[in-house]
Curated annotation (Swiss-Prot):
UMP binds at residues 57, 77, 138-145. It catalyses: UMP + ATP = UDP + ADP. Catalyzes the reversible phosphorylation of UMP to UDP. Its main location: cytoplasm. Belongs to the UMP kinase family. It comes from Coxiella burnetii (strain RSA 493 / Nine Mile phase I). GO terms for biological process: 'de novo' CTP biosynthetic process; UDP biosynthetic process. The keyword ATP-binding applies. This is Uridylate kinase. Keywords: ATP-binding, Cytoplasm, Kinase, Nucleotide-binding, Pyrimidine biosynthesis, Transferase. Pfam families: AA_kinase.
Length: 243
């Protein structure tokens, strides 16, 4: 029998924004942030937890912003998908330097750069002890990487989708604007919808609700938060079917 606390989850889908890789710098990717991410993921990996990651591309491009600048929205979304692949390559490099076995599976195949996404292949890699990074969203325009996270989480039978943000969880209001905003520790899907709380993209959120996929929202910038959310029910905000 294994002594000591055990992880709450066996297989997780971690959703990270592209902006998380910027840190506080002016560059799209901060190498120090990559090193910290690799350290955090290694801590969880060493517990025997299977880890899959969906990474955004907002540190390079956002389709909506490019549309406002005059670029066709569909074209802008494809540019954003390629940005997620650049981020995936950066993460893979950092993980490999930390001796983590890792594979990139892309919804847009790119021979010599990343393998094409295949559900069975993804599950096989996880079962073989490899970290899997999903790139290029769902491969479809007009679909957010939040939706890619909910979809991939359901496809790989993850125990939970971990939504990494820059705040400690889901609040009653924007904590940056309202210091009196309340941090929720536990919400049902219906409560979050009724209160119009910004948990994630609405389509992605409803998909998680419909397929009973729990969500944990937490602060990726908080030291040790990823490990804590795996081990501790109190870290971040849990959103599920409720009682």
């Amino acid at each position: 029998m294994t002594n000591g606390p055990q992880p709450l989850y066996r297989r997780v889908l971690l959703k990270m924004s592209g902006e998380a890789l910027m840190g506080k710098g002016l560059h799209a990717i901060d190498p120090n942030v990559l090193d910290r991410m690799a350290k955090d993921v290694t801590q969880v990996y060493q517990l025997g937890v299977q880890i899959a990651i969906v990474i955004g591309g907002g540190n390079f491009f956002r389709g909506a912003a490019l549309q406002a600048a005059g670029i066709n929205r569909i074209t802008g979304d494809y540019m954003g998908m390629l940005a997620t692949l650049m981020n995936a390559l950066a993460l893979r490099d950092a993980f490999e330097r930390s001796n983590l076995p890792v594979r990139i599976l892309s919804a847009i195949p790119m021979t010599g750069v990343a393998d094409a996404f295949h559900r069975r292949k993804a599950i096989h890699h996880l079962q073989q002890g490899r970290v899997v990074i999903f790139a290029a969203g769902t491969g479809n325009p007009l679909v957010t990487t939040d939706s890619a996270a909910s979809l991939r989480g359901i496809e790989i039978n993850a125990d939970v989708v971990l939504k990494a943000t820059n705040v400690d969880g889901v609040y009653s209001d924007d904590p940056a604007k309202n210091p009196q905003a309340k941090l929720y520790k536990h919400l049902s899907y219906q409560e979050a919808l009724k209160k119009e709380l910004a948990v994630m993209d609405l389509a992605a959120f409803c998909q998680c609700r419909d397929y009973n996929m729990p969500l944990r929202v937490f602060n990726i910038n908080k030291p040790g938060a990823l490990l804590s959310v795996i081990m501790n029910q109190e870290e971040g905000t849990l959103v599920d079917q409720g009682q």
